[in-house]
Amino acid sequence: MDLRAFIRLVPDFPKPGILFRDITPLLRDPAGFRAAIEQLAAGTATMGSLDYVVGIESRGFILGAALAQHLGLGFVPVRKPGKLPPPVLSQSYSLEYGQDQLQLHAHALRPGDRVVIVDDVIATGGTAAATAQLVAQSGAEVGGFAFLIELAFLSGRKLLPPEIPTHVVMVDESN
């Protein structure tokens, strides 16, 4: 199933000059949502044995939890600061204008665990790379990355380790 028809393009959101990819029409459609999860799951076949799906706030929670259920794995959320009770691991990363931070429960993952990191969109790659650093801090290993949409013109993959498999369902070349 071609999922592009379910992605709504919203110009100048959340800021002028941004073309937002709205996945809510996809989530609303049972067949489309199921196909998206199946296509994400198919991409994990090259990632070896996995223990957990790590979902990045916030749309990565939706896709990640559904993918975890589909694969029979546990789900671990990565959140913005102040959303998880302590103890947490923290990782700062650069934005276009400043810094941001992500957090992971300190005991959510253990050494030897293997995870796939999931988000709806890979744009600049900053949040995915920061999440991979959080996973490494925990002693776990990133087995792969899975994204619904890649904004290829932003070259976000360059921040991801090239030796780790990255699966993308849809590549968007337009800006």
Curated annotation (Swiss-Prot):
Where it mainly occurs, coarsely classed, is cytoplasm
One example GO MF annotation: adenine phosphoribosyltransferase activity
Q: Could you tell me the keywords of this UniProt record?
A: Cytoplasm, Glycosyltransferase, Purine salvage, Transferase
Q: Where in the cell is it found?
A: Cytoplasm
- A single GO BP: adenine salvage
What GO cellular-component annotations does this UniProt entry give?
cytoplasm
Q: In which pathway does it act?
A: Purine metabolism; AMP biosynthesis via salvage pathway; AMP from adenine: step 1/1
TM ranges: none
Pfam families, sorted = Pribosyltran (PF00156)
Q: Which Gene3D superfamilies match?
A: 3.40.50.2020
Q: Which reaction does it catalyse?
A: AMP + diphosphate = 5-phospho-alpha-D-ribose 1-diphosphate + adenine
- EC number of the protein: 2.4.2.7
Q: Which InterPro entries match?
A: Ade_phspho_trans, PRibTrfase_dom, PRTase-like, UPRTase/APRTase
Functional note: Catalyzes a salvage reaction resulting in the formation of AMP, that is energically less costly than de novo synthesis.
**PANTHER family linked:** ADENINE PHOSPHORIBOSYLTRANSFERASE
- Subunit details: Homodimer.
Family indicated by similarity = Belongs to the purine/pyrimidine phosphoribosyltransferase family.
Q: What is this protein called?
A: Adenine phosphoribosyltransferase
This chain's source organism reads Synechococcus sp. (strain JA-3-3Ab)
- Which gene produces this protein? apt
